A protein has these predicted regions:
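Auxiliary Fe-S-binding modules of radical SAM enzymes
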Residues: 2-12, 19-23, 29-57, 210-338
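Conserved, mostly hydrophobic/aromatic
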Residues: 66, 114, 146, 188, ...
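Surface-exposed cleft-lining segments at the edges of enzyme active sites
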Residues: 114-124, 172-173, 223-232
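Histidine/lysine/aspartate-rich catalytic loop segments that bind and position anionic ligands
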Residues: 175-177, 190-210, 218-220, 225
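Anion (oxyanion) recognition and catalysis
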Residues: 137-140, 192, 240, 247
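Conserved Radical SAM active-site core
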Residues: 20, 24, 32-169, 178-181, ...
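A general structural detector for well-ordered alpha-helical segments in enzyme core domains, enriched
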Residues: 128-135, 184-187, 238-242
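Active-site beta-loop-alpha junctions enriched in small/polar residues
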Residues: 117-119, 149-151, 174-178, 201-203, ...
Length: 338
């Protein structure tokens, strides 16, 4: 086998090893939390937060960000079809499941991402959504992170008792490029949610949201490059520009990963290892803690839960340099970042 050739900044053509890449004033090294350690290793958990609730699986592609969907890629690796949409059997009631001691598996105060292998507002899921809303209604002590590319469907899908919104729902729209930001953020603003954010992932084109941040409704912005099959490049200049807009508005900004193809100072880098991507994102110094987000969580009786009774995220040493550290719900001890 021919040896790999070493390029500038320590990268090898065709493979990435734990060597340094200089991004601005910060040195980036390999390392941390991955979906898989190489292109063909599949992880069961797809998460930058502590846990995930997938009440249904499968989706229909609807915009540019869907082109190289990670769920389709992972399903294909399992000889499954990502376009087949079905209600999950054991996972549907997950937020209500208890351990052997009778306590909820998901603790009060945790933040759970919903439908990470689908879209919560998918038309095909209409028959199941009311039951999912009921589960979130029962777990008013847990924050549910909703992310959609279909904000135009949301108002018609809200439960009858929604009112001005539930405090335990954090609603986000995907803005993979400027076209989708200009299309979806105005719809986001028109919807009755108490907590709103946006996610530029896959980040496949420059996005400016300064005019939208000025409205004061957006509490958090997440961005990250594209991964898996046929990943499109993420440009560090886009990240820096978006971050500055968030800093100016005092809105939390989190750069979770570079993506497989990353461009910095005109140079193109191939980084198939998501551990490396995550650590590089952290070491870039882009993450910014803006105004804190307060979720007023209540117990089964509707009483406020004291702060000392809420889940406290715990982290291990490797977590300290993870790109998602700023917004993560804590280490799940899955052992995959060792």
């Amino acid at each position: 086998m021919q040896p790999h050739r070493k390029g500038q900044n320590g990268f090898l053509f065709g493979v990435v090893i734990p060597v340094a890449l200089n991004l601005g004033s910060t040195t980036l090294v390999s390392g941390l939390r991955s979906y898989y350690n190489n292109r063909y290793r599949i992880e069961r958990r797809v998460s930058f937060l502590h846990d995930i609730w997938n009440p249904w699986h499968g989706c229909v592609k609807c915009s540019e960000g869907c082109q190289n969907c990670y769920m389709y890629f992972l399903d294909r690796m399992r000889d499954q079809n990502g376009a087949e949409i079905y209600k999950t059997k054991n996972g549907f009631s997950y937020p209500l499941q208890k351990d052997r001691t009778g306590h909820y598996k998901i603790q009060s105060g945790e933040q759970i991402r919903v439908c990470m292998t689908s879209d919560f507002f998918l038309e095909e899921a209409d028959p199941w959504r009311a039951e999912a809303w009921d589960i979130m209604r029962q777990r008013s002590d847990v924050v549910f992170f909703l992310l959609t590319k279909r904000p135009q469907r949301v108002r018609a899908c809200l439960p009858p008792d929604w009112g001005n919104g539930w405090d335990n729902i954090f609603f986000n729209v995907t803005c993979e490029n400027q076209r989708r930001a200009d299309e979806r953020i105005p719809l986001l603003f028109d919807l009755p949610f108490k907590h709103k954010g946006i996610m530029c992932a896959p980040f496949i084109g420059p996005v400016s949201i300064r005019q939208y941040l000025a409205a004061g409704q957006i509490e958090q912005v997440i961005c990250g490059g594209e991964n898996y099959d046929g990943a499109r490049p993420c440009n560090f200049d886009w990240v820096k520009s978006l971050r500055q807009e968030c800093v100016d508005a005092n809105v939390t900004f989190c750069f979770i990963e570079t993506g497989t193809v990353f461009i910095k100072d005109g140079k193109r880098y191939h980084l198939p290892n998501k551990q490396l991507q995550s650590r590089m994102a952290y070491k870039s110094g882009m993450n910014f803690q803006g105004k804190s987000i307060r979720f007023d969580l209540v117990d089964d009786w509707g009483y406020p839960i004291p702060q000392e009774n809420l889940y406290v995220p715990h982290f291990r040493a490797n977590c300290e340099t993870c790109g998602s550290r700023l917004i993560c719900n804590g280490c799940s001890n899955c052992g995959k970042c060792l």
